[in-house]
Swiss-Prot record:
GO molecular function terms attached to this record: rRNA binding; structural constituent of ribosome; tRNA binding
Annotated protein name in UniProt: Small ribosomal subunit protein uS13
Phylogenetic lineage: Bacteria, Pseudomonadati, Pseudomonadota, Gammaproteobacteria, Enterobacterales
Subunit-level organization: Part of the 30S ribosomal subunit. Forms a loose heterodimer with protein S19. Forms two bridges to the 50S subunit in the 70S ribosome.
InterPro entries, A to Z: Rbsml_uS13_C, Ribosomal_uS13, Ribosomal_uS13-like_H2TH, Ribosomal_uS13_bac-type, Ribosomal_uS13_CS
HAMAP family attached to this UniProt entry: Ribosomal_uS13 (MF_01315)
Length: 118
């Protein structure tokens, strides 16, 4: 198994799909990485040489991925909550942040129903 950005990349998958197992790299970004490194998208990771895997590693290090990206996201949410913005309050209360209705929907964000005690 190849190890890129601290993640074991599955050997049996094609390069484009295997790179998406890294948090922060989707299909489009993995296609751009393959084009920039000159590696064909349909080639499996197990068929790549060590030099090609090293070029993939170098290309991935140019992006914010994995732990750094997770930390960046949590810090930006924490910053919104500390500033007391509307979005921060919605995060703090566990409600939808982007303007969705909450009267009937939003069960995923709000959690299971709480019974009304009589």
């Amino acid at each position: 198994m190849a190890r890129i950005a601290g993640i074991n990349i599955p050997d049996h998958k094609h390069t484009v799909i295997a790179l998406t197992s890294i948090y922060g790299i989707g299909k489009t970004r993995s296609q751009h990485i393959c084009a920039a490194t000159g590696i064909a998208e349909h080639v499996k990771i197990s068929e790549l040489s060590e030099e090609q895997i090293d070029t993939l590693r170098e290309a991935v290090t140019k992006f914010v991925v994995e732990g750094d990206l997770r930390r960046e996201v949590t810090l930006s949410i924490k910053r919104l909550m500390d500033l007391g913005t509307y979005r921060g309050l919605r995060h703090r209360r566990g409600l939808p942040v982007r303007g969705q209705r909450t009267k009937t929907n939003a069960r995923t964000r709000k959690g299971p129903r709480k019974p009304i005690k009589k």
